Structure formats: C-alpha cells, structure tokens
Amino acid sequence: MMEQLKDALEYILTPSPAVFIVGGLIVLLVPILVHIFVERATPYTALPSILLVGPAGGGKTSLQTLLERGGDGHAPATHTSQTPQPVELTVSRDGMSILPFRESARDDAPGSHKKFLLVDTPGHGKLRNHAMDRIAGAISKASGNSKKQSSDGAGPVRGIVFVVDAAALDDGDGGLAAAAAYLYDVLMALQRRAGAGRTSRAPSAIHVLVAANKLDLFTALPASLVRSNLEAELGRIRQSRSKGLLDSGVGIDDIGSEEQDAWLGQYGSDKFTFGQMREFDIEVDVIGGSVLEGKVDKWWDWIAKRI
C-alpha cells in the first residue's frame, strides 16, 4: 500500500504533459465551480420597488428627479419618458421618525437606512404597457406562476403612486376621463391580483397613492375635489364597461363569478368610492402636493411607510 502511494506521489511530482494538463484544468475549473456554487447558494435579494404611473404631463419624471437629487430649488426640466427609468433611493429613519427626502438623500443621514427602487413609467397611452406589465408581474408572483424579476432588478412592488395634474381634472375636461380610464385599469389589475393566489394566504397588499400634483397653479383642484371627481368618473366608466349586465333582469346572486370579477369595487353598487377597494385589501389615498415648489413630503412619507 505504501509502495503504491509512493509511486503515485512520484508520478504527480514528476513533470510530464499529463500532470501539466490536469493541473491546468484544476486551476481553471475550481474557481468557476466555486463561483457557480456560491451564486446558487446565495439568494439574490432584489430591492423593493414603488411604481410611478399616471397620464403624460402629470409630473412623474420631475418627482422622481426631485426625490433622487433631494434639492431645495425648483424641479429640473424633464422630457417625456419612453421606457421605465428606475432610480435607487434610501428611506432613513431616526428612531420612529421618517426623515424628509432631502435629508434621506444625504450620505451622512442619521438613523437606519433602507434602499428601494422608484420606477418611473411612461404615461403616453401607447407606452402604458410598461407599467401594466409590471403590475401583471406582481399578479403572476401572487399566483405562483412566475419567479422572474424585472430586467432592471426591481423586486416586489410595494406601492403605486398615480401622479395626476390637479389642474386638468375638471369634470368637463378630457383630462379627467383619460386619467380615470388609466386609473381604472390599474385598480382593476390590483383587484384581480387579490384573488390570484393559489393558497389561502392572500398576496401582500399593494396600495395606491393618487398624488394630486401642481397645486401651485391657481386652477388646480384641491385633493378632496380630485378624489370626488375621480370617483365619479370611475363610476361612469364602470357603468359603461358593464353596460347591460345589471339591466338584464338577472339577480346579483345569479351572476357568474367571471362577470363579478370584471366589476371594479363593490359589485352592484350605484356609486363607486375608493373605500370599496378595501374589500380587496387595497387602500387608495389622495394627497395633494407640488413638485415645482418641492412640496412632496407627504408623498415621501407615504412611500417610506410602504418600504
């Protein structure tokens, strides 16, 4: 036995082409195998994300830029987004208090810190599929059909900030109908997500903030009127999209689940209110602010509480 071991050691230590080839393979393959093992053994932690959605011209990109830079001046000029643009931001807490976004942006901000991605999505009608695809991705994860992450590394969606121009939401203005139609699609997708889970455990809630922007303008509506106007328009959209369903003479109890799933909010209700979305574990808040004047602290607090 000892003789065989001695011969093996002598062969290994004797320079030869075979020894050089084996040694080279070991040097090349071992680091690769170790890297693959460590990569598979260590789960990749994607940052939680907040989506910025809403009609074009509402101020989504300006809001994202303001929160990213944390400046005290006027909001910088921006251009219409063509693709989703994520930026990494930090929520800082000093004890139980959430620091304002200007302080959170500092490298030396006190307290604990948590990073997240704020994803600006295009508001143009032909490009809204980017936002809806991300919401659909959240639905797929809730139902267990998908384990993929977005291409930019964004993790689970924790909230949706729907930015609207508060000066373009008069009852007779076309801007109200356009904003409400987009919001209807967003809320409908989230409502369907609530029932998409395969298990008895409900998916994590995704709440919505309607950020009524441009309150610095004289013609801007206060948050309370933005809320009531949107609720009324959403009710009209719901009625038109479900036309004939309630007038068919069929009782509510006789309506199939598929038809009820296509009804936003409380089924059969005459008026729509955001409060009806609580049935699906969706809170909808309407808060006013102004990106131009930097008055976005209430929006920042809302975002920070979801991270």
Positions of predicted regions on the chain:
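Conserved GTPase G-domain signal focused on the G5
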Residues: 59-60, 290-307
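Switch II (G3) loop of P-loop NTPases
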Residues: 110-137
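Amphipathic alpha-helical interface elements that mediate macromolecular binding in regulatory proteins
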Residues: 27-28, 61-65, 116, 129, ...
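Short acidic, S/G/P-rich loop/turn micro-motifs used as interaction or catalytic elements
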Residues: 59, 124-126, 166-171, 216-218, ...
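Core residues of folded domains in eukaryotic genome-function proteins
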Residues: 46-49, 83-87, 112-117, 156-160, ...
